[in-house]
Amino acid sequence: MEKIVKFDLKYDELLKKIPYKYAIPVVVAKRAEAIREYARPFVITDDENYVSIAFMELSLNYIRIKNEEILKALIPKVK
């Protein structure tokens, strides 16, 4: 039997793993749209909100950001 995931979103902890604060909502929105349209969620949960499910998947490393090297180039170097 598969475990039902309970989840409390901590955006600050997510930013420690993925330091691109503007990329996170885009990735989550795209994944939520995919779940709504055709994809099955990677986590089993009672939550029916697609955005919450996508945040769970990102936080639990079921999905990741592609081309992270390109995003690293966009981080400003502050002196």
UniProtKB/Swiss-Prot annotation:
GO-annotated cellular components: DNA-directed RNA polymerase complex
UniProt name for this protein: DNA-directed RNA polymerase subunit omega
Organism listed in the record: Thermotoga maritima (strain ATCC 43589 / DSM 3109 / JCM 10099 / NBRC 100826 / MSB8)
Keyword Transcription: yes
Described function: Promotes RNA polymerase assembly. Latches the N- and C-terminal regions of the beta' subunit thereby facilitating its interaction with the beta and alpha subunits.
Listed GO MF terms: DNA binding; DNA-directed RNA polymerase activity
Keywords linked to the UniProt accession: DNA-directed RNA polymerase, Nucleotidyltransferase, Transcription, Transferase
Catalytically driven reaction(s): RNA(n) + a ribonucleoside 5'-triphosphate = RNA(n+1) + diphosphate
EC code(s) of this entry: 2.7.7.6
Taxonomy of the source species: Bacteria, Thermotogati, Thermotogota, Thermotogae, Thermotogales
InterPro entries: DNA-dir_RNA_pol_omega, Pol_omega/Rpo6/RPB6, RPB6/omega-like_sf
